[in-house]
Amino acid sequence: MPKPGELTFVAPRGAKKPPRHIADLTPAERKEAVAATGEKPFRAQQLSQHYFARYAHDPAEWTNIPAGSREKLAEALFPDLMSVMRHISCDDDTTRKTLWKLHDGTLVESVLMRYPDRVTMCISSQAGCGMNCPFCATGQAGLDRNLSTAEIVHQIVDGMRALRDGEVPGGPARLSNIVFMGMGEPLANYNRVVGAIRRLTDPEPDGLGLSQRGITVSTVGLVPAMLRFADEGFKCRLAVSLHAPDDELRDTLVPVNTRWNVREVLDAAWEYADKSGRRISIEYALIRDINDQAWRGDRLGRLLKGKRVHVNLIPLNPTPGSKWTASRPEDEKAFVEAVAAHGVPVTVRDTRGQEIDGACGQLAAAER
């Protein structure tokens, strides 16, 4: 467990590197990898079709590839990357948490949430998190390692397969939104997260053919990475986990604020908004008697007034053994009114999955 305020930007050394998987590779790299096995390069397109369009990673399902070639190609590009340990459901089975065991025994989780008009999937980008926010169960557990691009992508592929096969009831049969809000700080695993976004949004069969506009990437405020992300040309939404409008409190709640303060983080966010044309989501966990005062809502509204922004207030999810708890209803209402008084759009998030430790901030608490 990290010390209070301690930050980990680089994953610990010594972790066994995940094996190479087709989802780690660009279309050109897939052709090279297939050719290296002695097979014709066009097999790469067939494999991509099976994985990204049919969600099939079992060679037995690759019926358009000769049986003698399947094992060789599977060994080269479809290693046993991760396996489902268990699924846990709630909300009449429309919310499902998946506990994954990675190739090295590391555990991560994803959450699939099906609504009448949309389907959202919350995915992990790291095993653990090095940002050490004191109210977040994942942050308190520390960082084990970064996930590979394929380990990130496979969470979504499995979710899309589950929807297609009717494993999660109700609502549309295709993912609408993907949020990088599970375990980890996405921008601390920059290259692999960017690679995952490309696989998710490349047209089928090179990728999953999802819309960039349906993807949200969260960050606690790694300013250099935010500025770099602004230059990628993505149309994803950027969500900034702010949690306090003043540096004095944010230094405590979000320790990375001691590196890049509120003003620097917001300036980087506005640059992303300008370059992407997307409004910024400000994530703010309301914590009783800590950051939920109406005057802080007023200060937040003043900071954000006139900007391309939306404030997403999050009732704090209870974590076993934590001193932190959710705001009183009357304090939440006063905070909302204080922000809205400045013309800033603000809503309170519908939190799902609390009973299965699946909501934001709880993904590591039950397994560590």
From Swiss-Prot:
Cofactor note: Binds 1 [4Fe-4S] cluster. The cluster is coordinated with 3 cysteines and an exchangeable S-adenosyl-L-methionine.
Keyword annotations: 4Fe-4S, Cytoplasm, Disulfide bond, Iron, Iron-sulfur, Metal-binding, Methyltransferase, rRNA processing, S-adenosyl-L-methionine, Transferase, tRNA processing
UniProt domain Radical SAM core: residue ranges: 115-355
SUPFAM superfamilies found in the cross-reference section: Radical SAM enzymes (SSF102114)
Obligatory cofactor(s): [4Fe-4S] cluster
InterPro entries: Aldolase_TIM, Methyltransferase_A, RlmN_N, RNA_MTrfase_RlmN, rRNA_lsu_MTrfase_RlmN/Cfr, rSAM
Reaction catalyzed: adenosine(2503) in 23S rRNA + 2 reduced [2Fe-2S]-[ferredoxin] + 2 S-adenosyl-L-methionine = 2-methyladenosine(2503) in 23S rRNA + 5'-deoxyadenosine + L-methionine + 2 oxidized [2Fe-2S]-[ferredoxin] + S-adenosyl-L-homocysteine; adenosine(37) in tRNA + 2 reduced [2Fe-2S]-[ferredoxin] + 2 S-adenosyl-L-methionine = 2-methyladenosine(37) in tRNA + 5'-deoxyadenosine + L-methionine + 2 oxidized [2Fe-2S]-[ferredoxin] + S-adenosyl-L-homocysteine
Positions contributing to [4Fe-4S] cluster binding: C129, C133, C136
Disulfide bonds: C122-C360
EC number per UniProt: 2.1.1.192
GO molecular function: 4 iron, 4 sulfur cluster binding; metal ion binding; rRNA (adenine(2503)-C2-)-methyltransferase activity; rRNA binding; tRNA (adenine(37)-C2)-methyltransferase activity; tRNA binding
Entry coiled-coil feature ranges: none
PROSITE patterns tied to this protein: RADICAL_SAM
Top-rank taxon, per record: Bacteria
Name of the top EC class for this enzyme: transferase
GO cellular component, one term: cytoplasm
Record family assignment: Belongs to the radical SAM superfamily. RlmN family.
Additional information: Reaction proceeds by a ping-pong mechanism involving intermediate methylation of a conserved cysteine residue.
Protein name: Probable dual-specificity RNA methyltransferase RlmN
Organism encoding this protein: Streptomyces griseus subsp. griseus (strain JCM 4626 / CBS 651.72 / NBRC 13350 / KCC S-0626 / ISP 5235)
Primary gene name: rlmN
